[in-house]
Amino acid sequence: MTTKRSLKALGVMLIFAAMIAVGMLNSPTQVRANGEGSDDGEKARIHRGLAIAPVHLNLHNKDRDLVGLGSYLVNGAMDCNGCHSSGPANEYIVPTGNPYFLSPPFTGKQQINPATYLGGGRDFGPFPGDPFPSIPHLYSRNLTPDHTGRPSGGLTFDQFRNIFRNGTDFDHVHPMCTAGPGDPDNCLVAPFNGDLLQVMPWPVYQNLTDHDLQAIYEYLKAVPCNPGPDIEGAPYLQNTCE
């Protein structure tokens, strides 16, 4: 009897242990390990980000993994340079110069102009030919690091995060108009809010994690300083590199 009871107890213990093992194998932790949020997934994004960076990166005193992830987000997912550049930002290697003209089909290869990369200056302001523009010139900002080594005119990370979370315009470039359009210069008419960035899609980007924002910030610290375009009425685009 004692032997039978011992064997029965042992069998119950083995079944219980097997149930625990199956549960662990099918736990959310294991599912995450096979998903995009896994360490392997992030390593792949870091590797791809470092591979597609279009300019030389200064990795001295930088977190290499954060820089790689930031490059993946800036260059591979968000196309920040598409807005934060002036002049010929991208030159697609196809005979037509346009990746949407299939001659031949676009293969993903492009050349980035380092002279304009993330230097700002693209105008999202009045429509051409509008005799009574209701909005001023809205230039994309210079995102590259200044002489402090911090991006976008020396922003701290807290300021940088605030921009993504709340759309805050720390430059206060566009005050609210007090006496109609254009008074004062560069003013925004109601219902636009002069304290907010008007073009940047921060209402979407505010959903990025702090880790993602830290990666973007670290990447922007690693790109070369761009002195920015010389545009009349937009001195805030100028960057002091040294």
Pin down the residues of each PLM region.
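Extended intrinsically disordered, low-complexity coil regions enriched in Ser, Thr, Gly, Ala
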Residues: L155-N162, D169-L197, P227-Y236
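Boundary at the C-terminal end of the N-terminal hydrophobic targeting segment
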Residues: V31-G35
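Bacterial N-terminal signal peptides
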Residues: V12-G23
